[in-house]
Amino acid sequence: MMLKPSIDTLLDKVPSKYSLVILQAKRAHELEAGATPTQEFKSVKSTLQALEEIESGNVVIHPDPSAKREAVRAKIEAERLAKEEEERKIKEQIAKEKEEEGEKI
């Protein structure tokens, strides 16, 4: 029985079989957790779906893991700052409304 995608095809996409296993496992976990698929799948199982994505080149190992971590940190920080700004605007609006109510009385 020939398995698709073949190991030879997959090893052209990643540096080693160990990297392939790690990449497949991480992507399968992401798919199980509800991550958006990058393509339509022939397979039902998330592990095989991950291999299909690797074969098509839609999922790759990040060449610089520290840069990826820094990008994730920057995104989280930007989201935090946006949330703080939104909270500040809401508090200002509430204070303004209370001030206007105080003038009416």
From Swiss-Prot:
Domain of life: Bacteria
Keywords carried by this UniProt record: DNA-directed RNA polymerase, Nucleotidyltransferase, Transcription, Transferase
EC number(s) per entry: 2.7.7.6
UniProt catalytic activity: RNA(n) + a ribonucleoside 5'-triphosphate = RNA(n+1) + diphosphate
GO MF annotations, alphabetized: DNA binding; DNA-directed RNA polymerase activity
GO cellular component, one term: DNA-directed RNA polymerase complex
One Pfam family named in its UniProt record: RNA_pol_Rpb6
GO biological process: DNA-templated transcription
Assembly information from the UniProt record: The RNAP catalytic core consists of 2 alpha, 1 beta, 1 beta' and 1 omega subunit. When a sigma factor is associated with the core the holoenzyme is formed, which can initiate transcription.
Protein purpose: Promotes RNA polymerase assembly. Latches the N- and C-terminal regions of the beta' subunit thereby facilitating its interaction with the beta and alpha subunits.
UniProt cross-references to PANTHER family, sorted A to Z: DNA-DIRECTED RNA POLYMERASE SUBUNIT OMEGA
Protein family (similarity comment): Belongs to the RNA polymerase subunit omega family.
Protein name: DNA-directed RNA polymerase subunit omega
Native source organism of the sequence: Streptococcus pyogenes serotype M5 (strain Manfredo)
